[in-house]
């Protein structure tokens, strides 16, 4: 298995410096990761540095709480794409989902999908650690209905990360034609392979180099 091509090499910490981002970009070039996943402020730099390399530029929208307005999320998406993003990972309105306001949740995702149409993949972060299984299923169903390309477990900034059980449930819910991304707490090759076996088609990690080299000692969390 070419695990590198399934990994979004991630650095999203608030104190990330340009030097940190450049290191992630160089590692992505060297190990040929699927993408670098960075905060919006770094998109332009990453797009310039990765031009001509087979590495996508992924950024985050409404991150990490998902509590921005729909209009803000749509604007963030357009702005990120204009600066060179080719993938966007958006956070759903978790509170609206818990309130049973499925219409708002779906519209929120739909507007981001429309803003990205034909220009960037949309991955929908449902923040599994805050949801019941029934809510996880609903979040996945609404994501598919709204036209998302992927559903994703976690921001890495809440109370928990990806589990194989959640990945299996999400895969079962979305079917074979929508991607499932495991993120949050994936630090070893064994972790990554467990997620893929459960149904993940992409893995978000900051310990990506350690995962590829199968080196548990090198694993750190940059979420």
From Swiss-Prot:
Predominant place of localization: cytoplasm
Associated pathway: Carbohydrate degradation; 2-deoxy-D-ribose 1-phosphate degradation; D-glyceraldehyde 3-phosphate and acetaldehyde from 2-deoxy-alpha-D-ribose 1-phosphate: step 2/2
E.C. numbers: 4.1.2.4
GO CC terms of this entry: cytoplasm
Keyword field: Cytoplasm, Lyase, Schiff base
Reactions mediated catalytically: 2-deoxy-D-ribose 5-phosphate = D-glyceraldehyde 3-phosphate + acetaldehyde
NCBIfam families reported in the protein's UniProt record: deoC
Name of the protein: Deoxyribose-phosphate aldolase
């Amino acid at each position: 298995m070419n695990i590198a091509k399934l990994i979004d090499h991630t650095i999203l910490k608030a104190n990330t410096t340009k030097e940190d981002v450049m290191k992630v970009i160089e590692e992505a070039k060297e190990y040929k990761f699927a993408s670098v996943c960075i905060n919006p402020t770094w998109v332009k730099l990453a797009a310039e540095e990765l031009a001509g390399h087979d590495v996508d530029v992924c950024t985050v929208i409404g991150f990490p709480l998902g509590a921005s307005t729909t209009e803000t999320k749509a604007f963030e998406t357009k702005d990120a794409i204009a600066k060179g993003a080719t993938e966007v990972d958006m956070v759903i309105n978790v509170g609206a989902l818990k309130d049973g306001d499925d219409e708002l949740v779906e519209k929120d995702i739909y507007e981001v999908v429309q803003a990205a149409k034909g220009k960037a993949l949309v991955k929908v972060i449902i923040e599994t650690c805050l949801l019941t299984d029934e809510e996880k299923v609903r979040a996945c169903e609404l994501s598919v209905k709204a036209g998302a390309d992927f559903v994703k477990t976690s921001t890495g900034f809440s109370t928990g990360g990806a589990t194989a059980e959640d990945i299996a449930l999400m895969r079962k819910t979305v079917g074979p034609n929508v991607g499932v991304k495991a993120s949050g707490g994936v630090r070893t090759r064994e972790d990554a392979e467990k997620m893929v076996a459960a149904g993940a088609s992409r893995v978000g990690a900051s310990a990506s180099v350690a995962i590829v080299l199968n080196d548990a000692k090198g694993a750190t969390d940059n979420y």
